[in-house]
């Protein structure tokens, strides 16, 4: 999970890597992705890409990480997912502080199932488990993870960036005199319940007739959400934008 792939975890790992780079050298192991060469060439990070079929990449990545840890001393290790941690040797992990991030979708595996067993076995090797919310921490505990290892760090954000005049004008066209103005930026998946936001907007119109909601993102649910917008008569109140917009 690393750019130029798009997503919340990808952005988080990029931000984490860039922040850590201010305090010393950072080595990144990540899967190949479309246009990765352009990204890597423009990045100041030392990135090793893993290619091949997905089923084999985790083994290749673990081999490279194990080899690196055998030959280098590091200050800390960060994993984006328990599957990235799974095949890294315990002997190396005991030598260095190590952290694994967790998000609810990636750990929601039924107790007693094979994925849950693999997950718990992997997490026994890590020193710190970083949950992005109290909800995720509680879910992790219910999935069998050690409570004492779990710490909550809510997702951060980059410092405000300069807004170009073109983007500022585009925002004024979209929002006009609307109030209140609501925005979400997320992948449009069923589990994120964007349909509930649309129904809430519908219920708020009597109180806030000038409300405007801008939903930024793409995903499997986009067509369904666009249809729901029409069914609820929210063509004026709800705008869908993709990343390219």
Report residues per predicted region.
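Carbohydrate-associated surface elements
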Residues: 135, 156
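A short helix/loop element that forms part of the nucleotide-sugar donor recognition site in Leloir-type
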Residues: 162-176
């Amino acid at each position: 999970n690393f750019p130029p792939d798009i997503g919340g975890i990808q952005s988080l790992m990029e931000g984490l890597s860039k922040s850590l780079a201010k305090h010393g050298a950072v080595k990144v192991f990540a899967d190949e992705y479309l246009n990765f060469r352009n990204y890597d060439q423009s990045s100041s990070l030392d990135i090793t890409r893993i290619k091949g079929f997905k089923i084999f990449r985790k083994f290749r990545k673990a081999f490279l990480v194990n080899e690196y840890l055998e030959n280098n001393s590091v200050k800390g290790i960060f994993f984006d997912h328990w599957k990235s941690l799974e095949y890294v040797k315990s002997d190396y992990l005991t030598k260095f502080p190590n952290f694994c991030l967790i998000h609810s979708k990636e750990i929601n595996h039924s107790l007693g199932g094979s994925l849950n067993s693999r997950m718990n076995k992997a997490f026994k090797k890590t020193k710190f488990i970083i949950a992005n919310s109290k909800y995720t921490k509680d879910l992790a505990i219910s999935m069998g993870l050690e409570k004492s290892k779990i710490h909550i760090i809510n997702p951060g954000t980059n410092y405000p960036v300069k807004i170009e005049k073109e983007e500022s004008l585009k925002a004024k066209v979209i929002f006009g005199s609307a109030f209140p103005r609501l925005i979400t930026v997320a992948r449009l998946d069923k589990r994120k319940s964007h349909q509930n936001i649309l129904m809430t907007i519908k219920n708020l119109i009597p109180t806030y007739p000038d409300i405007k909601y801008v939903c930024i993102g793409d995903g499997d649910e986009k067509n369904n959400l666009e249809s729901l917008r029409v069914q609820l008569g929210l063509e004026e109140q709800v705008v869908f934008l993709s990343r390219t917009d």
